[in-house]
Amino acid sequence: MHYPKVYDVIVIGGGHAGTEAALAAARMGRQTLLLTHNIETLGQMSCNPAIGGIGKSHLVREIDALGGAMALAADKGGIQFRILNSRKGAAVRATRAQADRVRYKAAIRETLENQANLDIFQQAADDLIVEGDTVKGVVTQMGIRFDAKTVVLTTGTFLGGVIHVGLEKSSGGRAGDPPSIALAQRLRELKLPVGRLKTGTPPRIDARSVDFSVMTPQPGDFPSPVMSFMGDVSMHPEQVNCYITHTNEKTHDIIRGGLDRSPMYTGVIEGVGPRYCPSIEDKIHRFSDKDSHQVFLEPEGLDTHELYPNGISTSLPFDVQFELVRSIRGMENAHILRPGYAIEYDYFNPQALKFTLETKAINGLYFAGQINGTTGYEEAGAQGLLAGLNAARRAWEQEEWTPKRDQAYMGVLVDDLITLGTKEPYRMFTSRAEYRLMLREDNADQRLTTIGRELGLVDDVRWAAYCEKMEAVERETSRLQHVWAAPNNPMGKKFVEMTGADLSKECSAIDLLKRPNINFGQIAELTGSEVSQQVGEQIEIAVKYEGYINRQHEDVAQLKRLEETKIPADFDYDVVSGLSREITQKLKTVRPETLAQASRIPGVTPAAVQLVMITIRKNNMTKKTA
């Protein structure tokens, strides 16, 4: 059947990348189709039941600032919230939400089903319709043809997916779901640069068989933080504890004894696993000097006894899993509900993508999520939103948009993937961002919401809330600049009494806030401020980090000069005098779009960038005089 409706955007896959891609395109007014193999698994958390964390929550906030769904779903489904790095600087603080899988998934599905311009259809996609070098649509498992101006692929671990438990293996996209074999074969036919990666998940445990009394409880923060700029604590369901226990030498001996049947250590798995989320057998091997490793027992939801033992991801045979779980303190009688497993899947070298996440080889075809070599819900959601918005803009022949490294962690993510490529699952960290003081979790809305409004991603309600917040920041900052404390006036005396600090001369409230040990809460009490915690936080950070932020702005100005120098798509690196063969080959492989991108390619020296710049200028001069 040839479906009668022609779509602007078709999104294949209903995971974290696919849902954000479909929602973004639909919010922008494009006729959008979301194809999923199973409507019941839309927004499913296939691995750990959590959103956020170091570097990751920055991405979630950016998705949220652009009108995305992930942060609000985390607020509606979160059963424990914590601020990580709370004693460190604002740049590296991160929010983490332990999520109820069912509630999170329900929140995502509700958002999808109530989004205008979005159709959902349950069918696996088996083929892409490509005419010349342009995608024209999709063919499903039943042979239904859907036509579209653009297609976004967000296939997760489903492309050629193989599940491993010990030396046993079976085809699967994840436990209980079939893989995407036909589509994987079709993509290989298109001569895109394909590789194999792997990820894994731990066995799930029945909480009724665990002795929590010998474990360390890990409560959430109080007052509870929120994930979304539009979130409220009233959205949160009941809050619960997680628990911490540890592996021991007995556990490690059991694991070592099973390595001869490990698919990782017998060469059965060829794909590379995530460096920063290693399996327990990998930890024992890589950190052989450690006597124990932490295990976090995380509830999977309020209406289930299922626990996620974070820290013991494994693909060892089930009998070894059984023994290693029962060797851990408090889990001596643990009942395993589901075995752990590893999954191996196809991914495509992201260096074959443009910065918009469109493939260089096929016009109108976009990739987002694990297909690009990343790991994590947050990384997937960020790519999905960018791919969806750019597919939407291309469909209407509008200029596409991708944030720069100084604008967003999304920009860092895309630039890293396309400039450096990846041979292992890529995870975001704050350390990857050179301008992280400007790219804080708390100011994602200030960086992106105005842009999102211009792109059509941000609705009236979010825009009004953002404008109200920024007006409040401006008003309160101005007020505090005109409130004065002096050694002999009542406010000055109150300040000294309250803080025990010295006050030798007249100071504005803003000047007092600049002091290292003074916080906005104290200034609010001193001056009778009634602004929200969010507004107070913005004022405090802006005041305390002003000098550092200004210095980063100067660094960004220098970078922008390089960013503004575009490298023509057909630039001939062979004619650049003085470039080594090695550097020439690297530049020809990556095909950087700007001098700034060229400077970030490993092995490309500043001198080489200068040579390219001189050649570009010579070419431009020649064209002008011709």
Curated annotation (Swiss-Prot):
Co-factor(s): FAD
InterPro entries tied to this protein: FAD/NAD-bd_sf, GIDA_C_N, MnmG, MnmG-rel, MnmG-rel_CS, MnmG_C, MnmG_C_subdom, MnmG_C_subdom_sf
Keyword Cytoplasm in record: yes
Binding positions for NAD(+) per the UniProt entry: 273-287
Pfam family, one: SAM_GIDA_C
MF-aspect GO terms: flavin adenine dinucleotide binding
Binding residues for FAD: 13-18
GO biological process, one term: tRNA methylation
Record's keyword terms, sorted: Cytoplasm, FAD, Flavoprotein, NAD, tRNA processing
Similarity remark: Belongs to the MnmG family.
Name of protein: tRNA uridine 5-carboxymethylaminomethyl modification enzyme MnmG
Gene name per UniProt: mnmG
